[in-house]
Amino acid sequence: MIILDGKKLSQKDTIFLKEKVNQFKIKPVFTIVQVGNLFSSNKYIKTKMDKALEIGVVSRLIKIPESISEKDLISIIEEESKISHGLIVQLPLPLQFDQSKILNSVPITKDIDGLSEKNSKNLYSGKSCIQPATARGIIDLIKEYNFTIKDKKVYVIGESNLVGKPIKELFKQAGAIVKSFNINTGIKGSEEADILIVAAGHPNLVKPENVKNNSIVIDVGINSIGENDKMIVTGDVDFSNVKTKVKAISPVPGGVGPMTVISLFKNLIEIFEKYLLDDN
């Protein structure tokens, strides 16, 4: 059984990106817009800021109080985009905001998360687009271990617009036979997948009976269980019991998470290189 080590691969990619950035006369500018002060968001933001520092890009954090109006928030995003090469809005947003509307205020040329509707439209129509970071990270992780995607049954548990659907689309474009499951209607049939990707947001949802022998399981879930100093992070897969049945599995933490972060910076560098070409 192989552990799909996203942390190890992301470090290899970090070295590659750092070497690229060192060759630039000016440095890419990466901006995070955060509304509120959610504890879990602060943790994820620190990870991204640390990675930016490691790679050598300029990082900026714009913290905004929850009391801001939607109109003013959009204005800030539009202004910050003008002085950034890549910008993300840290999710989740407070409930009073229209998440789609806020994400769509990020210009498509700066949308390194790949979550705006304009970028999604290009993705689903097969046009040139920024690959959504999580989906890109998963494909890169599977390819690193030389597993075949073409003609394989790739099933996705979870149908969210931000994660599940983009994952399904990218694997479809890579030549896989794709299928998705909505957890509200059950996951019966998931045990037929050659590659099972779980992005449901439900801890330990997938048990050994839900996976095929010698299959590949990718756990996208990040669930915090417990309180304060006793809090642990677990995925959507019952890792300790499923790992004995499969060919390869990604752990939580240390699997998809680091790959999502490094994919943001891959997208940033690609956007920045286009900017340099257009500027010449």
From Swiss-Prot:
E.C. numbers: 1.5.1.5, 3.5.4.9
PROSITE patterns with a match to the protein in the record: THF_DHG_CYH_2
Gene3D superfamilies to which the protein is assigned, alphabetical: Leucine Dehydrogenase, chain A, domain 1, NAD(P)-binding Rossmann-like Domain
Top-rank taxon: Bacteria
Keyword terms, alphabetized: Amino-acid biosynthesis, Histidine biosynthesis, Hydrolase, Methionine biosynthesis, Multifunctional enzyme, NADP, One-carbon metabolism, Oxidoreductase, Purine biosynthesis
GO molecular function terms attached to this record: methenyltetrahydrofolate cyclohydrolase activity; methylenetetrahydrofolate dehydrogenase (NADP+) activity
Keyword Hydrolase part of the UniProt annotation: yes
A GO CC term attached to the entry: cytosol
SUPFAM superfamilies listed in its UniProt record: Aminoacid dehydrogenase-like, N-terminal domain, NAD(P)-binding Rossmann-fold domains
Catalyzed reactions: (6R)-5,10-methylene-5,6,7,8-tetrahydrofolate + NADP(+) = (6R)-5,10-methenyltetrahydrofolate + NADPH; (6R)-5,10-methenyltetrahydrofolate + H2O = (6R)-10-formyltetrahydrofolate + H(+)
Pfam families in the cross-refs: THF_DHG_CYH (PF00763), THF_DHG_CYH_C (PF02882)
Family from the record: Belongs to the tetrahydrofolate dehydrogenase/cyclohydrolase family.
Functional description taken from the UniProt entry: Catalyzes the oxidation of 5,10-methylenetetrahydrofolate to 5,10-methenyltetrahydrofolate and then the hydrolysis of 5,10-methenyltetrahydrofolate to 10-formyltetrahydrofolate.
Stated name of the protein: Bifunctional protein FolD
